[in-house]
């Protein structure tokens, strides 16, 4: 996979994220309208208080009585609460719907990239991306798009309102809005991007190290390596803490600068208003209204200033997410090809390598239909790689692999997957029951079908001996089961899938001779209806094959 620190510009990131909002546009518009109306109510609560003071002092006021002023304050306060709640509810509804959509897209990207682009990928880093990085985008969707629109409309409205009294205090107020809501966020975002990226990467590295430490805890305790592991966790935590401290320092600096700018803007508006009052160009009522407006109208604009620090993390997280979504798969999915039925396979002059190492060199072999073909060879000779090429997890570099007369690169991916079942040396299990873990090979399988597959895999008796039988939870990553039991679940899945081409990579490596014999007899029975490609080191396993090949140094003999 590409380096997730591929640096997109903030503008490019914003455009990509905003495009996703299109289906939710009516709700977004409603949130903006309610936000502007809510801030209007909040500001005029203060202004009505000023009118009450003018009325009580016997000065000219738009409101006839103090009671009228307090009545307006009460009504606007209630409206402010309702509008604020509705705005936030709308924004968060949009945010959580879009986060769900992004998670769906990320899961689709992971499926598209698997396995070629994800082999060797740090799982802790992936977990951090799928959880923390996507969750960080909530700030953009719930607290950025709508607040930015609200702030722009609000600043224009308040500037026009003050300009109604006089243009000079309005210009002073507008200058403050621009400094706090535009210049400050841009400045802080540019200066904070590197720190934010470093923090997100440090967080991902820490998650990876902790996850690795938890999974290897048994070995760490056995070999008394706890001190070194603890030191490693401490080092990662200190690095993460230093990056977080740098971020918080910047956030504190932005808050201080924001408050200072608001104070100077208010003083500027007051000073200009008093100067105009002395010149007779602005009444006392205007001085009070302009000053109170400056004091109470910065709420939406301050939200933008605070975004400057927060958005640096959002953009860093979005960059990582977009890097994954944009990653091109090694083997693009075929949807406009052929749905070629399996009628045997042929490997013609195939060469393949990765990481600068040639693994297979011009190998050729024929896999006849409804036969058991065995492949043996030393570890690292390319046996498992050949199986993955037949599954089209990678594409061959030279030569071709054919189903019948059709190159598998022209076979529709869905059709190819439906016709192949691969059992690897490591069986991945989900935190679910044994039955459901087997049933992922065929979701609509009846219980009788599941049990029949388990009998073929020498697993049924073991499952029935458990108190909950097929409803027994396997734990995280199948932690409650032995390696042999997990492997037999993988074999049972393949039998249940009922694909015409069965690829078995060391299917009995973790089994005793008794269970190996049961499975091999089942494989022999299955070859009446299926083609089986069997990879193994064991001579006893190879004895089940109709024809055998040996892979040595990337060549077949």
Positions of the model-derived regions?
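Transmembrane helix-loop-helix hairpins at lipid-water interfaces of multipass membrane proteins
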Residues: 28-83, 164-168, 281-284
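Membrane-integrated ABC transporters
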Residues: 1-42, 62-69, 87, 91, ...
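Transmembrane helices of ABC transporter permease
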Residues: 23, 27-40, 143-198, 271-282
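Short intracellular "coupling" helices and adjacent cytoplasmic loop segments at the cytosolic face
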Residues: 2-9, 90, 96, 104-128, ...
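Helix-loop-helix
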Residues: 55-71, 161-176, 250-319, 324-325
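ABC-type nucleotide-binding domain
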Residues: 340-557
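Cytoplasmic coupling helices
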Residues: 89-108, 149-150, 173-218, 225, ...
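An intracellular "coupling" helix at the cytosolic face of ABC transporter transmembrane type-1 domains
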Residues: 18-26, 115-118, 132-141, 145, ...
């Amino acid at each position: 996979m590409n380096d997730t620190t591929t640096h997109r510009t903030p503008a490019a990131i914003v455009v990509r994220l905003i495009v996703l909002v299109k289906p939710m546009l009516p709700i977004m518009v409603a949130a903006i309208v309610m936000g502007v109306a809510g801030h209007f109510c909040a500001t005029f609560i203060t202004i009505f208080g000023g009118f009450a003071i003018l009325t009580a002092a016997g000065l000219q006021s738009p409101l006839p009585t103090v009671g009228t002023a307090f009545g307006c304050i009460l009504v606007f306060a209630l409206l402010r609460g309702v509008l604020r709640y509705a705005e936030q509810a709308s924004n968060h509804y949009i945010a959580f719907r879009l986060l769900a959509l992004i998670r769906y897209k990320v899961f689709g990207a992971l499926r598209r990239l698997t396995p070629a682009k994800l082999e060797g990928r740090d799982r802790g880093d992936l977990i951090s991306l799928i959880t923390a990085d996507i969750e960080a985008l909530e700030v953009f969707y719930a607290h950025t798009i709508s607040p930015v629109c609200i702030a722009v409309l609000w600043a224009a409205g308040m500037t026009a309102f003050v300009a109604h009294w006089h243009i000079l205090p309005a210009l002073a107020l507008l200058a403050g809005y621009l400094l706090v809501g535009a210049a400050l966020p841009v400045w802080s975002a540019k200066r904070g991007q590197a720190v934010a990226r470093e923090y997100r990467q440090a967080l991902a590295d820490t998650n990876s190290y902790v996850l690795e430490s938890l999974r290897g805890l048994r070995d760490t305790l056995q070999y008394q390596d706890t001190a070194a592991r603890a030191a490693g966790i401490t080092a990662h935590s200190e690095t993460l803490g230093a990056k977080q401290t740098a971020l918080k320092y910047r956030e504190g600096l932005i808050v201080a600068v924001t408050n200072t700018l608001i104070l100077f803007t208010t003083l500027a508006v007051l000073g200009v208003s008093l100067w105009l009052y002395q010149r007779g160009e602005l009444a006392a009522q205007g001085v009070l209204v302009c000053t109170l407006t400056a004091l109470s109208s910065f709420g939406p604009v301050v939200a933008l200033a605070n975004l400057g620090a927060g958005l640096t993390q959002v953009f860093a997280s979005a960059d990582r997410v977009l890097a994954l979504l944009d990653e091109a798969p090694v083997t693009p999915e075929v949807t406009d090809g052929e749905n070629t039925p399996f009628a045997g396979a042929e490997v013609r002059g195939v060469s393949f390598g990765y990481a600068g190492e040639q693994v297979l060199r011009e190998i050729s072999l024929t896999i006849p239909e409804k036969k058991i073909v065995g492949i043996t060879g030393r570890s690292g000779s390319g046996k498992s790689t050949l199986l993955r090429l037949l599954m089209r997890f990678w594409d061959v570099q030279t030569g071709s692999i054919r189903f019948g007369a059709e190159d598998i690169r022209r076979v529709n991916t869905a059709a190819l997957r439906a016709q192949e079942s691969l059992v690897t040396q490591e069986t991945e299990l989900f935190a679910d029951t044994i039955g459901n873990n087997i049933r992922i090979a065929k979701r609509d399988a009846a219980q009788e079908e599941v049990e029949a597959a388990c009998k073929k895999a020498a697993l049924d008796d073991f499952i029935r001996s458990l108190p909950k039988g097929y409803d027994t939870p396997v734990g995280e990553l199948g932690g409650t089961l032995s390696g042999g039991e997990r492997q037999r679940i993988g074999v049972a899945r393949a039998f249940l899938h009922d694909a015409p081409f069965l690829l078995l990579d060391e299917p009995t490596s973790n089994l005793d001779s008794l269970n190996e014999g049961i499975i091999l007899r089942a494989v022999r029975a299955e070859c009446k209806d299926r083609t089986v490609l069997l990879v193994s080191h064991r001579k006893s396993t190879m004895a089940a094959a109709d024809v055998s090949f040996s892979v040595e140094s990337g060549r077949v003999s």
